[in-house]
Structure formats: C-alpha cells, structure tokens
C-alpha cells in the first residue's frame, strides 16, 4: 500500500498539529503525578519558607537592615562571639565573591551580624575596618534567628537575602565560595530587581 501525496500531507499536518497537544498532555500528567527532577541548580540550601527580614529585627551600623530594602542583594554572615579565623576566612571569601562579580558588585551588599551583643574584640574590629571597609556590621537577638540559621551557627553561615528582604538561600563553610558566586551570578543575571 502506497500513500498518495495527498494522504502523506495529511499525516504530516496531523503530526504537526498533535505533537504540541501530546506534549502538553504528558507534561500535565507528569506534573500532577508528582514526577519532577530531583536535582536543583542552586548550590546553597534553598529555604522551604523564605525568612522575612522584617521578622528578624536586625540592626546595622546604617540603621535597621529592613530600611535598606528594596535595594540590593545581601550576603549576611552571622557570628557568635568574636570573629575567629573561620569567620575571617568567610569574610575574605565574601569579599572575593563581591570583587569577582565585577560590574554587578554594586548590586550586592555584605553584612556581618553578631548575636545578642557586639562581642567583636578591638583587634577584630580594627582588622574588619581596615581590610573590609565595605562590610556593614550589625546585631540581632538570638531568639529572632530562625532555626535553620541557628543549626548552622558554628559554621558562620551566609544567608542570601533578595532585594525585597527575603532570605532565600543558606550557605555554610562546607560549600566552596565559588558555589555562592555561581548562584549570585545566576540570580543577578535573571533578576529584574536590585
């Protein structure tokens, strides 16, 4: 049995017409069945529920942190007590990330937030002021911190806050700083705010 040109054209037209409908049907079936890829492209821990900045009640050297928003993407690092060698390593990494962002570095602010009271030694404060002049210092009460951050407090975690004041990604020292840089570049490239 041979197909005439007329029938062959109809089959091609039907295939072209039905392919998008079939793809739509299959994608809907996969979505509602719960099937989805397991991996994500972000390197930090994506918080199930974003941490709203207004609930944290930060105070920074330039005033309450929520007054800064809407504004810039923010890398917020937490420290419990004085800034140790591990703390300074993460400060150095966040500064290098900011430098490597090049033209987008002005879209990102960095904060070091101390718990309960400013327990940084004079030597730490002097080192921060000389080596990290663009770093903002701040305070937060321990009971205002969400459990996700408290669990990682020993690692001087980073919290990435979007320009609208939502903490969305959490990073710890086990993750190389290049991973935070990759996430930031992706976010800055695709963001219409900040």
Protein language model regions, located:
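N-terminal targeting signals for export/organelle localization
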Residues: 1-57
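Short, ordered coil/turn segments that flank beta-strands lining enzyme active or ligand-binding pockets
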Residues: 61, 71, 163
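Short active-site neighborhood of thiol/selenol oxidoreductases, capturing the structured segment around
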Residues: 67-95
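Conserved beta-strand segments of the P-loop GTPase G domain that flank and frequently precede/overlap
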Residues: 76-79, 111-114, 140
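Short, internal strand/loop/helix patches
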Residues: 109-111, 124-157, 161
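Thiol-/selenol-based redox modules, centered on thioredoxin-like
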Residues: 154-155, 160-194
